[in-house]
A protein has these predicted regions:
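A short alpha-helical cap/connector motif
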Residues: 1-202
């Protein structure tokens, strides 16, 4: 997308090769047990939570942002690797803050207004916000470009059920991978933001 000045980052470049069989077999029952909606925790390809948990294992000692807390499922999945800290954001409380886990912090605010963040130490940003019109997502991408951030972005609902998000996904020029096979049934995408990481299937 936009060319940004190169900055030194604390997080080294990763070769993120996704092993479908490992994702499918990942045990996340301990996280499901903490969920407000355990009936939503289905197998990979229907539900994205095993994929999110798996991707958290590529990083150590970093911060992961969950943009769009809702009832906390995605934050729980992203908290799988306890060596990382997850910060989950929503504009309205929807019950997630009742979930207690040592490496999750819940915040009611726009993440772009959080001046406590160290973007050099943010490894993953998961974006799943309403109203799924593609406009907010594009504005968030522009914000991250202005910050000069580099890392892994996860997007939900990139398939034809949500045409505005699908259109936004198709216009992304950074290296990207449709990971819906082990993600959510409505489509899940992974983006190497500013070409930080190499994304592939194993």
């Amino acid at each position: 997308m936009f060319d940004m000045a190169t900055k030194t980052k604390k997080i080294t470049k990763k070769n993120i090769a996704i092993d479908k069989e490992v994702v499918k077999a990942l045990d996340i029952d301990h996280l499901k047990a903490l969920s407000l909606n355990p009936h939503d925790w289905h197998e990979s390809g229907t539900c994205e939570y095993r994929l999110y948990a798996y991707l958290s294992t590529f990083f150590k000692g970093t911060t992961i942002l969950d943009v769009g807390s809702r009832t906390g499922g995605s934050a729980l999945a992203l908290s799988y690797n306890e060596e990382n800290q997850v910060i989950s954001y929503d504009l309205v409380e929807q019950g997630a803050s009742s979930i207690k886990r040592d490496n999750i912090t819940w915040k009611i605010q726009d993440f772009r207004d959080d001046d406590t963040l160290d973007y050099d130490n943010i490894s993953i940003i998961m974006i799943d916000v309403d109203p799924h019109d593609g406009k907010q997502e594009e504005e968030m991408f522009e914000f991250l470009e202005e910050k000069g951030w580099k890392g892994l972005v996860l997007l939900d609902d990139i398939g034809p059920l949500w045409p505005d998000i699908e259109d936004f996904w198709n216009r992304i020029t950074f290296p990207k991978l449709d990971v819906s096979d082990v993600g959510h049934m409505s489509g899940t995408g992974a983006v190497s933001f500013d070409s930080k990481h190499k994304l592939s299937w194993k």
